Regions:
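Conserved nucleotide-binding/hydrolysis micro-motifs of P-loop NTPases
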Residues: 19, 42-43, 74-78, 100-105, ...
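Signal for well-folded cores of large energy- and translation-related assemblies
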Residues: 8, 45, 60-61, 88, ...
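Residue-level signature of catalytic and energy-coupling elements of molecular machines
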Residues: 3-4, 22, 37-39, 56, ...
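Conserved C-terminal guanine-recognition region of P-loop GTPase G domains, centered on the G4
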Residues: 30-32, 55-124
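Alpha-helical membrane-interface segments at transmembrane helix boundaries
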Residues: 256, 260-264
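Alpha-helical transmembrane helix bundles of large polytopic membrane transport and channel proteins
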Residues: 95, 105-249
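Conserved G1/Walker A P-loop phosphate-binding module
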Residues: 1-49, 62-63, 67
Length: 265
Protein backbone atom coordinates (compact mmCIF):
# COMPACT_ATOMS: atom_id res chain seq x y z
CA UNK A 1 0.00 0.00 0.00
CA UNK A 2 2.90 2.38 0.70
CA UNK A 3 4.22 1.80 -2.81
CA UNK A 4 0.71 2.18 -4.26
CA UNK A 5 0.32 5.55 -2.51
CA UNK A 6 3.67 6.75 -3.86
CA UNK A 7 2.77 5.73 -7.41
CA UNK A 8 -0.75 7.18 -7.45
CA UNK A 9 -0.62 10.10 -5.00
CA UNK A 10 -4.15 11.42 -4.53
CA UNK A 11 -5.47 9.93 -7.79
CA UNK A 12 -7.30 7.13 -5.95
CA UNK A 13 -10.77 5.62 -5.78
CA UNK A 14 -11.87 3.59 -2.75
CA UNK A 15 -14.84 1.22 -2.55
CA UNK A 16 -15.64 -2.45 -1.99
CA UNK A 17 -15.20 -5.46 -4.25
CA UNK A 18 -18.55 -6.80 -5.54
CA UNK A 19 -20.30 -9.15 -3.13
CA UNK A 20 -17.77 -8.86 -0.29
CA UNK A 21 -16.80 -6.33 2.36
CA UNK A 22 -13.21 -6.19 1.13
CA UNK A 23 -11.86 -2.72 0.40
CA UNK A 24 -11.09 -1.98 -3.23
CA UNK A 25 -8.52 0.67 -4.07
CA UNK A 26 -7.50 1.77 -7.54
CA UNK A 27 -5.65 4.79 -8.83
CA UNK A 28 -4.04 6.47 -11.80
CA UNK A 29 -0.26 6.68 -12.02
CA UNK A 30 0.85 10.21 -11.13
CA UNK A 31 3.24 10.49 -14.05
CA UNK A 32 1.13 8.59 -16.58
CA UNK A 33 -2.62 9.06 -16.24
CA UNK A 34 -3.18 6.41 -18.94
CA UNK A 35 -2.14 3.72 -16.45
CA UNK A 36 -4.54 2.49 -13.78
CA UNK A 37 -3.36 0.38 -10.85
CA UNK A 38 -5.51 -1.91 -8.69
CA UNK A 39 -4.18 -2.30 -5.15
CA UNK A 40 -5.08 -5.95 -4.56
CA UNK A 41 -5.23 -7.43 -1.04
CA UNK A 42 -1.93 -8.93 0.04
CA UNK A 43 -1.58 -12.69 -0.49
CA UNK A 44 1.16 -15.28 -0.02
CA UNK A 45 -0.12 -17.80 -2.55
CA UNK A 46 -2.75 -18.33 -5.26
CA UNK A 47 -4.60 -20.88 -3.10
CA UNK A 48 -7.10 -18.63 -1.31
CA UNK A 49 -8.28 -19.26 2.25
CA UNK A 50 -9.83 -15.87 3.04
CA UNK A 51 -12.18 -13.45 1.23
CA UNK A 52 -9.24 -11.09 0.64
CA UNK A 53 -7.13 -13.81 -0.96
CA UNK A 54 -10.03 -14.95 -3.14
CA UNK A 55 -10.61 -11.37 -4.36
CA UNK A 56 -6.97 -11.04 -5.40
CA UNK A 57 -6.87 -14.44 -7.10
CA UNK A 58 -10.16 -13.97 -8.96
CA UNK A 59 -9.09 -10.59 -10.30
CA UNK A 60 -5.77 -11.94 -11.55
CA UNK A 61 -7.53 -14.81 -13.34
CA UNK A 62 -10.25 -12.57 -14.81
CA UNK A 63 -7.98 -11.71 -17.78
CA UNK A 64 -8.46 -7.99 -17.02
CA UNK A 65 -4.92 -7.25 -15.84
CA UNK A 66 -2.34 -6.28 -18.47
CA UNK A 67 0.60 -6.51 -16.08
CA UNK A 68 1.39 -7.44 -12.47
CA UNK A 69 3.56 -5.30 -10.20
CA UNK A 70 4.63 -7.85 -7.61
CA UNK A 71 5.96 -6.28 -4.39
CA UNK A 72 8.60 -8.56 -2.86
CA UNK A 73 10.03 -8.10 0.64
CA UNK A 74 13.78 -8.18 0.07
CA UNK A 75 14.37 -9.21 3.71
CA UNK A 76 12.21 -12.32 3.31
CA UNK A 77 13.03 -13.28 -0.25
CA UNK A 78 12.39 -17.04 -0.32
CA UNK A 79 8.93 -16.82 1.25
CA UNK A 80 7.88 -13.96 -1.04
CA UNK A 81 9.13 -15.64 -4.22
CA UNK A 82 6.71 -18.53 -3.67
CA UNK A 83 3.88 -16.23 -4.75
CA UNK A 84 6.03 -14.76 -7.52
CA UNK A 85 6.42 -18.18 -9.18
CA UNK A 86 2.63 -18.60 -9.16
CA UNK A 87 2.04 -15.11 -10.55
CA UNK A 88 4.45 -15.81 -13.42
CA UNK A 89 2.45 -18.95 -14.24
CA UNK A 90 -0.76 -16.93 -14.72
CA UNK A 91 0.73 -15.78 -18.03
CA UNK A 92 0.32 -12.13 -17.06
CA UNK A 93 3.63 -10.25 -17.46
CA UNK A 94 5.19 -9.75 -14.01
CA UNK A 95 7.54 -7.02 -12.79
CA UNK A 96 8.94 -7.45 -9.28
CA UNK A 97 9.58 -4.50 -6.98
CA UNK A 98 12.30 -5.70 -4.61
CA UNK A 99 11.15 -3.52 -1.72
CA UNK A 100 12.87 -2.72 1.61
CA UNK A 101 16.24 -3.00 -0.11
CA UNK A 102 17.57 -0.33 2.30
CA UNK A 103 16.71 -2.55 5.29
CA UNK A 104 18.51 -5.48 3.65
CA UNK A 105 21.62 -3.33 3.14
CA UNK A 106 21.52 -2.48 6.85
CA UNK A 107 21.62 -6.21 7.63
CA UNK A 108 24.86 -6.57 5.69
CA UNK A 109 23.21 -8.53 2.88
CA UNK A 110 23.11 -7.92 -0.85
CA UNK A 111 20.95 -9.16 -3.70
CA UNK A 112 22.29 -9.02 -7.23
CA UNK A 113 19.18 -7.61 -8.90
CA UNK A 114 20.36 -8.45 -12.43
CA UNK A 115 21.02 -12.08 -11.50
CA UNK A 116 17.69 -12.32 -9.69
CA UNK A 117 15.91 -10.94 -12.74
CA UNK A 118 17.73 -13.30 -15.10
CA UNK A 119 17.06 -16.48 -13.12
CA UNK A 120 13.44 -15.55 -12.31
CA UNK A 121 12.79 -14.57 -15.90
CA UNK A 122 11.06 -11.28 -15.03
CA UNK A 123 12.18 -7.64 -14.65
CA UNK A 124 13.25 -6.83 -11.08
CA UNK A 125 13.83 -3.32 -9.69
CA UNK A 126 15.25 -2.54 -6.24
CA UNK A 127 12.91 -0.15 -4.43
CA UNK A 128 12.41 1.48 -1.05
CA UNK A 129 8.96 2.89 -0.32
CA UNK A 130 10.42 4.49 2.81
CA UNK A 131 13.19 6.33 0.94
CA UNK A 132 11.09 6.65 -2.23
CA UNK A 133 13.78 5.12 -4.46
CA UNK A 134 13.26 2.99 -7.57
CA UNK A 135 9.53 3.80 -7.75
CA UNK A 136 9.50 5.52 -11.15
CA UNK A 137 11.77 2.85 -12.64
CA UNK A 138 9.59 -0.07 -11.53
CA UNK A 139 6.44 1.59 -12.89
CA UNK A 140 8.13 2.13 -16.27
CA UNK A 141 9.25 -1.51 -16.35
CA UNK A 142 5.74 -2.73 -15.51
CA UNK A 143 4.20 -0.47 -18.16
CA UNK A 144 6.67 -1.75 -20.75
CA UNK A 145 5.72 -5.40 -20.09
CA UNK A 146 2.03 -4.82 -20.93
CA UNK A 147 2.84 -5.51 -24.60
CA UNK A 148 4.38 -8.93 -23.83
CA UNK A 149 2.69 -12.11 -25.06
CA UNK A 150 2.71 -15.57 -23.50
CA UNK A 151 5.39 -16.59 -26.00
CA UNK A 152 7.68 -13.89 -24.57
CA UNK A 153 7.43 -15.19 -21.01
CA UNK A 154 9.86 -17.50 -19.21
CA UNK A 155 8.15 -19.83 -16.73
CA UNK A 156 9.87 -21.48 -13.74
CA UNK A 157 11.13 -24.90 -14.82
CA UNK A 158 10.75 -27.86 -12.47
CA UNK A 159 11.86 -31.50 -12.37
CA UNK A 160 11.54 -33.18 -15.79
CA UNK A 161 9.01 -35.68 -14.42
CA UNK A 162 6.73 -32.90 -13.15
CA UNK A 163 7.18 -30.96 -16.40
CA UNK A 164 6.10 -34.07 -18.33
CA UNK A 165 2.93 -34.29 -16.23
CA UNK A 166 2.18 -30.59 -16.75
CA UNK A 167 2.63 -30.96 -20.51
CA UNK A 168 0.29 -33.96 -20.58
CA UNK A 169 -2.39 -32.06 -18.62
CA UNK A 170 -2.04 -29.11 -21.00
CA UNK A 171 -2.72 -31.47 -23.90
CA UNK A 172 -5.82 -32.83 -22.16
CA UNK A 173 -7.10 -29.32 -21.44
CA UNK A 174 -6.74 -28.05 -25.00
CA UNK A 175 -8.91 -24.93 -25.29
CA UNK A 176 -10.86 -25.59 -22.09
CA UNK A 177 -8.97 -22.84 -20.25
CA UNK A 178 -7.74 -19.35 -21.23
CA UNK A 179 -4.51 -19.96 -23.14
CA UNK A 180 -2.67 -17.17 -21.35
CA UNK A 181 -3.18 -18.91 -17.99
CA UNK A 182 -3.10 -22.51 -19.24
CA UNK A 183 0.07 -23.47 -17.34
CA UNK A 184 -1.36 -22.05 -14.11
CA UNK A 185 -4.53 -24.13 -14.50
CA UNK A 186 -2.57 -27.27 -15.42
CA UNK A 187 -0.45 -27.01 -12.26
CA UNK A 188 -3.47 -26.26 -10.08
CA UNK A 189 -5.29 -29.29 -11.50
CA UNK A 190 -2.22 -31.41 -10.83
CA UNK A 191 -2.29 -30.15 -7.21
CA UNK A 192 -5.98 -31.15 -7.13
CA UNK A 193 -7.00 -27.61 -6.19
CA UNK A 194 -10.72 -27.97 -5.39
CA UNK A 195 -11.53 -24.37 -6.33
CA UNK A 196 -10.07 -24.75 -9.82
CA UNK A 197 -11.67 -28.17 -10.27
CA UNK A 198 -15.07 -26.66 -9.46
CA UNK A 199 -14.57 -23.63 -11.71
CA UNK A 200 -13.63 -25.50 -14.87
CA UNK A 201 -16.23 -27.17 -17.06
CA UNK A 202 -14.23 -30.27 -17.93
CA UNK A 203 -15.65 -33.45 -19.42
CA UNK A 204 -15.57 -36.75 -17.55
CA UNK A 205 -12.98 -37.98 -20.04
CA UNK A 206 -10.71 -35.00 -19.31
CA UNK A 207 -11.05 -35.43 -15.55
CA UNK A 208 -10.25 -39.15 -15.80
CA UNK A 209 -7.18 -38.49 -17.97
CA UNK A 210 -5.89 -35.89 -15.51
CA UNK A 211 -6.50 -38.24 -12.56
CA UNK A 212 -4.42 -40.92 -14.31
CA UNK A 213 -1.58 -38.47 -14.97
CA UNK A 214 -1.56 -37.43 -11.31
CA UNK A 215 -1.66 -41.03 -10.04
CA UNK A 216 1.24 -42.15 -12.23
CA UNK A 217 3.35 -39.10 -11.31
CA UNK A 218 2.69 -39.62 -7.59
CA UNK A 219 3.86 -43.22 -7.95
CA UNK A 220 7.04 -42.07 -9.68
CA UNK A 221 7.83 -39.45 -7.02
CA UNK A 222 6.40 -41.52 -4.11
CA UNK A 223 4.79 -38.29 -2.89
CA UNK A 224 1.35 -36.75 -3.13
CA UNK A 225 0.78 -34.25 -5.94
CA UNK A 226 0.52 -31.14 -3.76
CA UNK A 227 3.80 -31.95 -1.98
CA UNK A 228 5.53 -32.52 -5.32
CA UNK A 229 4.63 -29.02 -6.50
CA UNK A 230 5.48 -27.35 -3.18
CA UNK A 231 8.89 -29.06 -3.04
CA UNK A 232 9.65 -28.23 -6.67
CA UNK A 233 8.73 -24.58 -6.18
CA UNK A 234 11.01 -24.25 -3.18
CA UNK A 235 13.82 -26.08 -4.98
CA UNK A 236 13.52 -23.59 -7.86
CA UNK A 237 13.42 -20.63 -5.44
CA UNK A 238 16.43 -21.94 -3.54
CA UNK A 239 18.44 -22.14 -6.77
CA UNK A 240 17.43 -18.60 -7.72
CA UNK A 241 18.34 -17.21 -4.29
CA UNK A 242 21.70 -18.97 -4.25
CA UNK A 243 22.52 -17.31 -7.55
CA UNK A 244 21.40 -13.85 -6.44
CA UNK A 245 22.16 -13.47 -2.72
CA UNK A 246 25.45 -12.54 -1.07
CA UNK A 247 26.41 -11.50 2.45
CA UNK A 248 28.82 -8.58 2.79
CA UNK A 249 29.77 -9.85 6.27
CA UNK A 250 30.84 -13.19 4.81
CA UNK A 251 32.90 -11.41 2.19
CA UNK A 252 34.57 -9.16 4.78
CA UNK A 253 35.47 -12.18 6.88
CA UNK A 254 36.91 -14.00 3.88
CA UNK A 255 38.96 -10.95 2.93
CA UNK A 256 40.24 -10.66 6.51
CA UNK A 257 41.24 -14.31 6.47
CA UNK A 258 43.16 -13.75 3.23
CA UNK A 259 45.02 -10.79 4.73
CA UNK A 260 45.88 -12.82 7.84
CA UNK A 261 47.29 -15.57 5.65
CA UNK A 262 49.40 -13.09 3.71
CA UNK A 263 50.74 -11.52 6.93
CA UNK A 264 51.45 -14.96 8.39
CA UNK A 265 53.45 -15.91 5.33
Amino acid sequence: TSLFNLITGHNQRVGNWPGVTVERKSGLVKKNKDLEIQDLPGIYSMSPYSPEEKVARDYLLSQRADSILNVVDATNLERNLYLTTQLIETGIPVTSALNMIDVLDGQGKKINVDKLSYHLGVPVVATSALKQTGVDQVVKKAAHTTTSTVGDLAFPIYDDRLEAAISQILEVLGNSVPQRSARFYAIKLFEQDSLVEAELDLSQFQRKEIEDIIRITEEIFTEDAESIVINERYAFIERVCQMAESHTEDFALTLSDKIDRIVSN
